[in-house]
Design a protein with these regions (language model features):
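Short acidic/glycine-enriched loop/turn segments that link adjacent beta-strands
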Residues: 42-45
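Conserved catalytic cores of phosphodiester-cleaving nucleases, focusing on short active-site segments
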Residues: 27, 47-53, 57-71, 89
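Metal-dependent nuclease catalytic cores in nucleic-acid-processing enzymes
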Residues: 90-102
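Acidic-basic catalytic patches of nuclease active cores, encompassing PD-(D/E)XK
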Residues: 1-38
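Mg2+/Mn2+-dependent nuclease catalytic core
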Residues: 69-93
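Domain-level recognition of nuclease-like catalytic cores that cleave nucleotide substrates
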Residues: 100-142
Length: 142
């Protein structure tokens, strides 16, 4: 998917693309390196951000989902990632590793960067700090 927000196909995608950029910038400030944005496997799924997390002992490949949601009775951004969505992300990550075997030896982790907006927040208070959840869910039997 193009990195230029004006090329995204819907207002929802353009809005989400803005949060993905904020998330990517935030994670880079934490020392992660962005490898890919909006990586897609046709008919399987898309991963918002794929990053390398350099650590002292080994590097970790991070597949990150970015979610923004208004807090409501239906839960926050983190809770919006259903088991079905997790399975789709895991399946897409497997395709990424098949297409990029040079990363296959790395430890892998699924993170979420969540943005929760309070319902009724004024525009002046609309900016939301990202909540970074490392290892938000696990893949069984890679």
């Amino acid at each position: 998917m193009p990195s230029n927000p004006s090329l995204l196909s819907s207002p929802k995608q353009r809005h989400g693309g803005g949060y993905e950029k904020i998330a990517a910038d935030f994670l880079q400030q934490q020392g992660l390196v962005v490898l890919a944005k909006n990586w897609q496997q046709p008919n399987v799924g898309e991963i918002d951000l794929i990053l390398l997390h350099p650590e002292e002992v080994w590097n970790t490949l991070v597949f990150a989902e970015v979610r923004k949601r208004k807090v409501s009775n239906y839960g926050d951004a983190l809770m919006s990632i259903t088991r079905a969505k997790q399975c789709k992300l895991i399946k897409t990550a497997r395709f990424f590793l098949r297409h990029h075997p040079n990363y296959a030896h790395l430890e892998c982790r699924f993170d979420v960067v969540a943005f929760n907006e309070q319902v009724g927040a004024s525009k002046a208070h609309k900016f939301i700090q990202p909540e970074w959840v490392q290892g938000a869910f696990m893949a069984n039997a890679w």
